[in-house]
Amino acid sequence: MRGKLITLEGIDGSGKSTVAKKLQENSELRVFEPVFTREPTRGTLTGNAVENAIQSDTDQLAELFLFTADHAEHLAKLVKPALEDGKTVISDRYSDSRYAYQGITLKNRLDNPLEWVRDLHRGWTVIPDLTFLFDIEPEIAVKRCGKRGEQTKFEKIEFLRGVRELFLGLAAEEPERFVIVDASGSPEDVEKAVVQKILDFVQRIE
């Protein structure tokens, strides 16, 4: 039986990646041996190219294609093989991040960037079975980002407002796939809520 793909999404500063790390250490989840991964990938040719683009003034379209190339490589080398092996894959960021983030970065370049980016993925990407959207007010998120040190170009409040709006729009379109998580609480409380939802989901499909 094909495995299931679970993704974690949210704006920068939502605490998503902090919770993703906690999930890897969670004893309740270890029972079904999930495969943990992330986008952009780390230590790969495509992932390194994306990280360099994020830290530089790369053209927005070029940046999109770098993200998409990394996604394709990620699917081919890790996600699809793991799913075909019947494993549950949990990814910190996935295609919805591209739809929301590049939907904003390209708004002055394309008439409908969100749909354009989605069309770019149709026919070859793997749609997640369950997506957690870590929702938080951009003002709180930016403060959290500031505590981490130097901010990236994506960690600006007006930009994150637009990204959050697109994320919530995506969730409204597919309520059966998305679970909106209040990310304003402590990482421990958020982790507990997410773990319970994952366990419920896994038990339901077994």
UniProtKB/Swiss-Prot annotation:
GO cellular component terms attached to this protein's record: cytoplasm
InterPro entries in the record: P-loop_NTPase, Thymidylate_kin-like_dom, Thymidylate_kinase
One MF term in the entry's GO annotations: dTMP kinase activity
One of the Pfam families matching this protein, by short name: Thymidylate_kin
BP-aspect Gene Ontology terms: dTDP biosynthetic process; dTTP biosynthetic process; dUDP biosynthetic process
EC number assigned by the record: 2.7.4.9
Gene3D superfamilies listed in its UniProt record: P-loop containing nucleotide triphosphate hydrolases
Top-level EC class as recorded in UniProt: transferase
Record's keyword terms, sorted: ATP-binding, Kinase, Nucleotide biosynthesis, Nucleotide-binding, Transferase
Reactions the enzyme catalyzes: dTMP + ATP = dTDP + ADP
Keyword ATP-binding assigned: yes
Protein transport recorded as keyword: no
Residues the entry annotates as binding ATP: G10, I11, D12, G13, S14, G15, K16, S17
HAMAP family: Thymidylate_kinase (MF_00165)
Sequence similarity: Belongs to the thymidylate kinase family.
Name of this protein: Probable thymidylate kinase
Record organism: Methanosarcina acetivorans (strain ATCC 35395 / DSM 2834 / JCM 12185 / C2A)
Gene assigned in the entry: tmk
